[in-house]
Each structure stands twice: as structure tokens, then as C-alpha cells.
Amino acid sequence: MKRRRFLHGGAAAVASSALPPFAPQGVPAADQNPPSWTLSAASARYVVRLRGAALTVDCFHPGDAVDRADGAPSPPDDAALVAVGPARRPVAWRVAASRQADASNLRLVLSADDPPLIADVVFAIDGATGLLVRDTSLRHHGIGAAVDIVATLAVWCAIHEPIDSMLYLAGAWAHETQLQHGPSDGALRLESRTGKTGFEFQPYLALRTPRSTYLCEIFWSGNWILQATPQPQGAVLRGGLNDWRFRHRLDAGRRLALPSVLFGRLEGDLNAATQRLHDFRRARRPDPDRPIPVQFNSWYPHAGEPTAESMLALVPVARRLGCEAFVVDAGWYRTDEGESAADWASRTGDWRTSHVRFPNGLREVSRACRDHALRFGLWFEPEVIGPLSAIRRAHPEWMHHLDGKAPAPDQRAVLNLGIPAAWQHAFDRVTRILSAVGVDWMKWDFNADLGAGGWAPGLPAALTDQDPLVAHYQGLYRLQDAIRRWFPELILEMCASGGGRLDGEILAHAHVNWISDQPGALRKLAIHFGTQLAHPAVVCNDWLVDWPPGDTAATAADADGIDERGDLAFRLHVAMLGSFGISARADRWAAADFATVAAHVALYRDTVRPIVHHGDQYLLTATPPADGNGDWAAIWYVAKDARRGVLFAFRLASPETARVFALPGLLSAARYRAAAVAGPVTVLPGSALAAGLPVTIERPFQSALWVVETD
């Protein structure tokens, strides 16, 4: 979560059990290659074609003639699936094998002789959502010289409907995921060159037509690129790994997995498409049915310097609020060489408990949490090594060398998880603490920019032939999975100074992600609207922070201070839009405020959480402006069985005290009890609620939370 001292500078395969296996075949003559393959979903038809160096997908309305693909735009030179060598020569392919079990699944094996490469490609339409997922893996034939891969494409897709608008997410630290509208007459290029998913853009794009929505999402946590180029009757999308300073050498028997890419044409508006995306992403999460506990986090009450005394004082407070987990954030550790008065950022990497801060060890706090029926959580930054770390001096070769340079002695460094010994160090140190202390929740932070990454000199070629970021992130995903295997009940939360590394791949290996270091509720409301276009609410972790107003220091990104508008209920309702927690000096709250928060925690746990985490989301208004000077904002979540829903309504600067919100997704003939928190109950049929529920909010910067349940 902490943004300071920044460094500058393989994707999970979709399940394909329905596909019958096929044996590798010899490379046939070119005239044996099938020209195209067609995949069909309820709202889309996809034509896959091999065009020399390019493997393309043309997407149509299911009623359109398939042969319109013959008029599709020809792929340009940079549409090649793979380019090799300093000259970036496109690789020409032919089909070595194919297997299409049905209209939803396709496997291709493509082969090239010069260079000696094979591409294994799987297209699978998800039966539950109709979304198409492509997985691509490159491997060396086994005969011939090593191949220097310098560019790849994980997707090239042509859309054959006129596009009304292109929607994407852009931002900065503490101002993530602001909804943007792309140009209608020029190419849109989204990318990261920071060595992580990035604050600047999300690897997400939505394109709207009068009758449909197209979605594209790249599942990758390192440098990526996603481009959209409007055409007279549609658009072309291309993307995958960013080829900026990319080089990956494949020797005989070596393999490179490209990022998984999700794509789809879906009938209806953006809400309908987002619901299907959320369904897919929820199913891809670890332990998708496990509730995310309401947590109390120590960062804002005791930023960077927790102690046994301060934590033990807050544990019973968290319990009285109704929280389910208590997480000790950064600062609990020392280095192998002993105690230090240096700040939390300088001491990361060795992961030894500080006995100055915790004289009886962390186990004392863990036991106190158990005694109060709380899970115990602990913050780590496994990849980032502080300048005081002993392991850094013992093994400088384990650190990323950006631009070929060793990290400066007084700066933080990044442990290269592509190095097996470095990976093992991180695994051993983290799991030792998790086991010894009894940790149920691990918060995994990453306060660094990696650029293109880099290898230390003198490492074996078997390592340095790999692109350093590819090696690092494949190691990261393995480390996430290994820790969860060792501790199957553990909740794994990811963070990168907020939403700096928030993507569909890192969240295929973790449960939840801290979405922003932004402490202001008004700005955070806009961040929720944007983030929840690309990610389901269950993975979006947020806290009640700045209460009472002015109690929290502003981030450097908000030099003018935190916008203090919004009462306590408003701030609670914003934080309850995803997974929910508290990080504030609750021990100093007035009794009435404490009771208000405790009541909201109980309501969230018992009623709101299962609907928000697993239901369909409808954005009922436009994204509110980050400065709060907008009209109204509203989000409606409805359970999959259509028997329950929750409405969050926020009055911003609007002079109007009332709005009517249509609540879709309910059973027309069923009768529902609808009530705002602490308000009277109204009984209405689903058809009446679909026509509109009147909501009154008396003052600006107040909110209402309505619960709707079958009578």
C-alpha cells in the first residue's frame, strides 16, 4: 500500500478437459492445412485463420455470413504471432495438427522450420459466459540453433461492427482506474513499461456498438500492450506482452507461455457484458466460494511502526466492531543483523520478528486474536529487499539489475523470483513466519517499479536467456500457489502501492487486492466504479479510513489534502462496495460513531457481502467525478437467484434530494421488502421495483443503502 522509494527502471491455461487429447503429428505439406476454423457462442461467431505469420480471429454477430471474413483487413507486418532476431523477422507458420471437438473448443499446433519453433494454441469458449479465451505456448523444435524471440502477439482480432465508443481505464497512484473514452478516429494504445500491470492503464478494453459490447482483457502482471485501431466497419485489437526491451531465447526443449487473453462479443449494454466478465473472473479465483473476512488493518492507526502494545490494544476493539480478521501491516520485522531504528522500508527482505517492537514475539498478538475469535494477518513484501537486508549483501546476484546496473546501496532492490535460489529464499522465510506465528491472512505488497527487469552479471545462460520479467512473474505465480498449497486456509491479499499490480492473472493466484492508497471516500468512489468494470467486487478490497475527517494524513498524490466531504455512513458505504475492512483509530471514536460502524459491519457480514461478492452488478449512473462535484452515483447488486439485492446510492453535490432508480434483475411477480438502513419497509412487486424505486437523501454528500428481499 505504501508509495515511496520506487525503483525505476506464464499465464494460467484455461481449463480444457472437454477437449479430447491428440498426439503430435509430423509437419504436413502446406496444402493439407485447413484454411480456417469457426467457433460459435450464443452472441458471437469467431473465425480463426492462419495468414502466413499471423494467427487472426475475426469476430461477427452470429447471424452474419461467415464468408465476410474474406473481406477482413489484412494483418500488417506487426501482426505476426512471433518475431525473431535483431531484424524482428516475422515467423511464417503452417498447421502441424488441429483438433476441434465442437464449436466451442479448438486446439492448433503450428510449426515453423526457420526458426525451429512450434506454437501450441488453445481457443476455448467458456460455457457459462460465452467469452473466448486464448492460450498460446511457444516451444523449440528440439533441433537447430536457439531462437531469440523479440516480439509476440497473444491476440489479433478484427471486429466487424461499427464501433460507437471505446472505453478504457487510466490513472495514477491513488487515482487509479478512471474511466476514459477513446478516440473514434485514431488508434488507441494502452501499455505498461513499469515492470508491473501499472497505474497508468489497466489491460482492459470495452468497445460499444448500438447492440453489443466487446470486451478484451490481458491476463499478465508485467509489461503488456493492448491496441485498438478503428476501421470503417469495426476495429482491430492486438496485444499481449509488451515488446519494449523484450528478449527471450528458446533453446531446445524450452517453452514460453504467452499471457492468456479473454475476448468476447456480448449482446446488450456494458452492464450485461460486465456481469459475464465478473462471472468468468470469479470462477477463475482460488477458493471462489470462500467469504473474504471483514478485516481490521493496522496501517492507518500505526503507519509503519506497529508494536505489541498498540496491536494488543486494538485487537479487542476490532472484535467489538465485528471484524473477522486483524492484520498487522508493515514494520513488525528486523533484519538478520539485528534491530534498527530505520523505517519499515529499509528493513524488508530478511523477515525476522523485531523483539524491540514485539518482545514476546508475534505469537502473542496471534494468540490474542484467537482469544477474540479473530483471524490473524501479517504484511510482507516478499519481492522487495531493503538496503539494510543481510540477504542482499550475501547474494547481490539475486537482485534485479535494471539497465544492467546493480541497485544503489541506499535504495531498495527487487528480488528476482526467476532465480531458483532467490525464489526458495522468499518461500522459506515467508512460510517459516506463517507457520511459527499462525497466520491466516497474508498481505503481499509490492512498492517498486521494475522497468524491463534485468539479470545480474555472471548468472548461467539457462537463466539469463529468459526475459527477466517473464521469469520473474512465472516465479511469482508459482510462489503464490506454493504458499497457498502449504497453507490452504490462508487468505492471500495482493497490493502494489494500491492498484499498481491489479490484473486478472495475479488474481487467479490470490483472493483479493487492495485497490488504492487513496484515503478519501469521494475519490475512492470513482475508483470503485472504474475498477469494477474490469474486476469483480469480491477482489476489490477497501477500508473505512479517514474517520473522523482529518484524522488521516493525505498521500503525496493529494497535496491539497483529503476531501473531507461525506458523513460516516457515506464513507462506510463506499468501502462496502467490495471486500471490506477498517483501518482507523477506532479506539478514539465517539460511542455513537462506534455503534454506527459496528452496525454496518454486521449488516455487511450478514446481508451485503454474499450479494456484492457473488451477484450481478449494475452501474445505475455514470462514473462520478473524482472531485465529488457531480450529481448522484448509484450501484445495484442483485443475487443470482433474483431474490435479494442491495442498492448503494450516493448524493454528491446535486441540489436535488430525490432520485428514482430502476432495479433490474428481479422476479417480476415476486413481492419484495425494500428498506433503507434504519428506514421503514416498503413491500412492492418486482415489476414495480424494475420501474423505479424512489430514493431520498436530504443533504449533499450523504448516502443510502437499501436492502431488497423477497417477502
Q: Which residues fall in each region the model found?
A:
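Polysaccharide-binding surfaces and accessory modules of carbohydrate-active proteins
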Residues: 33-50, 55-229, 244, 671, ...
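Short Pro-Gly-centered flexible turn/kink motifs
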Residues: 248-266, 702-708
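Glycan-recognition surfaces
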Residues: 386, 391-424, 470-587
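Carbohydrate-binding surface patches
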Residues: 624-668, 705
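C-terminal beta-strand-rich structural cap/linker in extracellular carbohydrate-active enzymes
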Residues: 686-711
